[in-house]
């Protein structure tokens, strides 16, 4: 559904030629396509020291269906360790057939007839035959992606909301007040107050609860009364959302922040970098940023690992990096 909303599988694929010749790269020849030789792939994968996973999407075999642009899962693999090899694979899905390796190393068929749009994570979760599927599924589910917080007048974060204990801020920030109060009541009140003071010196944050609905008030130096969440500037509200996300009492294995500098005053970016650096001690944090100020502030933190991306002939690339410069990775074939 997510791919369909953005134009289907073709919108997620490289729109340039299958291969760029040296003459094309130098500008000596026009960039033009050729007859495609390799199958269409959209491949995603990740690995750590314990487990790795890869999925390979492709187009269906042309037929009478009008859904010929729906992606199909051609291959899924789970393996032990950081690099896939046939000997380290523990779960292997090829088309509709799924095999899992048993305790003695022999392969057992655990599913035959899996739908082309169905992942092993949604259809198979037997802890006896393939515990790695269940383990990896729960690990992925715990990841958090914060892409864009709305701050317009109708934004959920600006409205008082029914609240319960909230150890994880929702993606739309609707439970902001409950999330901040949860942080305070679980023993991190001083850390919360310090994060607010680092960005807004002299400010004091208060969570209100009336008839089960939670709201926010922020008292600031120079003002005769605290401001409610509906009155806060876009930047102030968004910064409070980042505080709630990064001070979570339940840190994930991976948290991705997409352009957290949006709507923030440049003076807030050093404080945001310190907040991110502190959170990275409890979770792996990926930050996608375009602000030189935020990037410089993050680089000043000892744990920062900067990866610069550039655009070359329409492609996203790592400048000065070749195939041998990246981490060792092997894609399972079809």
Language-model regions, residue ranges each:
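Short, Φ-rich (hydrophobic/aromatic) sequence segments
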Residues: 1-2, 136-140, 180, 240-247, ...
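Phosphate-binding glycine-rich loops of NTP-binding sites
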Residues: 1-19, 239-245, 288, 293-296
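Conserved P-loop NTP-binding catalytic core
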Residues: 1-62
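Electropositive, glycine-dotted interaction segments
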Residues: 41-43, 47-186, 190
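Short, mixed charged/polar active-site loops
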Residues: 50-54, 224-226, 315
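Conserved ABC ATPase signature
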Residues: 194-247, 254-270
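A cross-kingdom feature that marks ATP-driven nucleic-acid transaction machinery
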Residues: 227, 231-238, 246-249, 256, ...
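C-terminal lobe/lid and adjacent interdomain/linker elements of RecA-like ASCE P-loop ATPase modules
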Residues: 270-334
């Amino acid at each position: 559904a997510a791919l369909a909303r953005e134009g289907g599988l073709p919108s997620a694929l490289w729109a340039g030629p299958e291969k760029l010749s040296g003459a094309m790269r130098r500008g000596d020849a026009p960039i033009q396509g050729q007859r495609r030789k390799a199958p269409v792939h959209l491949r995603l994968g990740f690995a750590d020291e314990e487990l790795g996973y890869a999925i390979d999407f492709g187009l269906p075999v042309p037929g009478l269906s009008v859904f010929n642009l729906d992606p199909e899962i051609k291959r899924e693999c789970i393996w032990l360790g950081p690099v896939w090899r046939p000997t380290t694979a523990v779960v292997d899905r090829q088309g509709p057939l799924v095999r899992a390796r048993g305790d003695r190393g022999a392969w057992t068929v655990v599913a035959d007839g899996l739908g082309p749009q169905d992942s092993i994570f949604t259809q198979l979760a037997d802890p006896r035959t393939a515990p790695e599927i269940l383990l990896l599924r729960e690990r992925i589910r715990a990841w958090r992606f914060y892409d864009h917080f709305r701050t317009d007048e109708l934004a959920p974060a600006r409205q008082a909301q029914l609240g319960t204990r909230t150890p994880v801020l929702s993606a739309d920030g609707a439970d902001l007040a409950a999330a901040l109060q949860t942080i305070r009541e679980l023993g991190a009140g001083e850390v919360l107050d310090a994060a607010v003071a680092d960005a807004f010196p002299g400010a004091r944050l208060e969570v209100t609860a009336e008839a089960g609905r939670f709201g926010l008030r922020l008292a600031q130096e120079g003002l005769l009364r605290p401001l409610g969440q509906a009155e806060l500037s876009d930047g102030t509200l968004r910064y409070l959302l980042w505080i709630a996300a990064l001070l979570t009492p339940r840190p994930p294995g991976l948290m991705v922040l997409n352009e957290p500098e949006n709507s923030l005053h440049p003076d807030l970016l050093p404080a945001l970098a310190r907040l991110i650096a502190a959170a990275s001690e409890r979770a792996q944090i990926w930050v996608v940023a375009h602000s030189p100020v935020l990037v410089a502030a993050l680089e000043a933190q000892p744990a920062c690992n900067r990866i610069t991306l550039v655009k070359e002939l329409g492609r996203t690339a790592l400048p000065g990096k070749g195939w041998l410069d990246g981490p060792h990775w092997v894609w399972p074939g079809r």
